[in-house]
């Protein structure tokens, strides 16, 4: 397993709230919590930037992390990430923040310590572009947006 340096920015982590951990052996994501001073509401149509109390330093340029929504928040409450996905580059060392957007028509309450997003580590491939006049022919060619059919 790859080791990633994590800096605890909020002393409640490890005392009042656990470090992010994988829920099962098959879990891809680690839950991130709202580490605010008090509970708050996100009004309909509003976006808020929420601290998680953590910083990570991935260091390995072949890895990055993405902050993704928790499926239940979007499906049950209409609350999603304000930037859809957050990308954490391997050389970033600042605090992890979560942008939450309430796209529902009701206020959404966030309690201190609520799990609000998940962090997933992913491999990185940096591409080198090769300029060509034409691509090698494939069966699909330029077909997109529904090209492969519905059934």
UniProtKB/Swiss-Prot annotation:
SUPFAM superfamilies (UniProt xref): dUTPase-like
EC number(s) from the headed UniProt entry: 3.6.1.23
Annotated catalysed reactions: dUTP + H2O = dUMP + diphosphate + H(+)
Keyword Oxidoreductase attributed: no
Role played: This enzyme is involved in nucleotide metabolism: it produces dUMP, the immediate precursor of thymidine nucleotides and it decreases the intracellular concentration of dUTP so that uracil cannot be incorporated into DNA.
Protein residues bound to substrate: 70-72, 83, 87-89, 97
Pathway: Pyrimidine metabolism; dUMP biosynthesis; dUMP from dCTP (dUTP route): step 2/2
Any GO BP: dUTP catabolic process
The protein's required cofactors: Mg(2+)
Alphabetically ordered keywords of this record: Hydrolase, Magnesium, Metal-binding, Nucleotide metabolism
Organism the protein comes from: Actinobacillus succinogenes (strain ATCC 55618 / DSM 22257 / CCUG 43843 / 130Z)
Similarity field: Belongs to the dUTPase family.
Protein name per Swiss-Prot or TrEMBL: Deoxyuridine 5'-triphosphate nucleotidohydrolase
Gene3D superfamilies: 2.70.40.10
Annotated InterPro entries: dUTPase (IPR008181), dUTPase-like (IPR029054), dUTPase-like_sf (IPR036157), dUTPase_trimeric (IPR033704)
Membrane-spanning residues: none
An annotated Gene Ontology molecular function: dUTP diphosphatase activity
